[in-house]
Design a protein with these regions (language model features):
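Extreme N-terminal starter segment of soluble prokaryotic enzymes
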Residues: 1-4
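Active-site-proximal alpha-helix that buttresses catalytic centers in soluble enzyme cores
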Residues: 6, 10-71
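Short, active-site-adjacent cap segments at secondary-structure transitions
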Residues: 12, 57-59, 81-82, 148-150
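Acidic, low-complexity terminal tails and accessory targeting/binding regions
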Residues: 41, 75, 81-94, 138, ...
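Short beta-strand scaffold positions
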Residues: 52-53, 123, 143-144
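Active-site-adjacent alpha-helix immediately C-terminal to a catalytic or transition-state-stabilizing loop
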Residues: 59, 126-164
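Phosphate-handling substructures
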Residues: 67-126
Length: 164
């Protein structure tokens, strides 16, 4: 099985450099263009399954890159973005030392209060991939988020700490 993992395209909140965890925001024009470019680069690959987190930005990106209707995208909440709690919608550059260092080294530092732990993120992403491994797919597309991609790659690369 070949697994294709990508992050969703740009949203207005991404453009404003705001932490966007569980806030449900659609793609902006740039994000739509990014997804179309990715589809072009992939070429004529057919995906046996197209998965996305339940957030609009991931579903839209998955439908475009996967070349399927939105209704055909398999939604799975285990690949939703990290819950940033009180840091949601804060500027990337104004997070403060605790969140900045945690996000740089989440496997070494405790999560700030209200922020989802790395253990939780790893547990749900590994559950998703272990279930996926049982499927008989040739090509699978997974469209999710920057945070969860770290734990998906950690599992696929067999990292001891479970995160990349």
């Amino acid at each position: 099985m070949k697994i294709w993992i990508t992050r969703h395209g740009q949203t207005a909140l991404n453009k404003q450099k705001l932490m966007q965890g569980l806030t449900d925001e659609p793609l902006n024009e740039t994000g739509i263009k990014q997804a179309k470019e990715a589809r072009k680069k992939i070429g004529d690959i057919h995906f046996d399954a197209v998965y996305a987190s339940p957030l609009q930005r991931a579903i839209q990106t998955a439908a475009i890159i996967g070349n399927v209707d939105k209704k055909d995208v398999k939604i799975d909440s285990r690949i939703i973005e990290v819950d940033f709690g009180d840091y949601e919608l804060r500027n990337y550059f104004k997070l403060g030392l605790k969140m900045t260092t945690y996000w740089a080294l989440p496997e070494l530092l405790p999560n700030p209060k209200s922020v989802e732990s790395v253990e939780s993120m790893i547990k749900r992403s590994q559950s998703f991939l272990k279930e996926l491994e049982k499927k008989n797919y040739e090509n699978v597309l997974i469209v999710c988020h920057g945070g969860i991609i770290r734990s998906l790659c950690g599992y696929l690369e067999d990292r001891k700490n479970g995160i990349k």
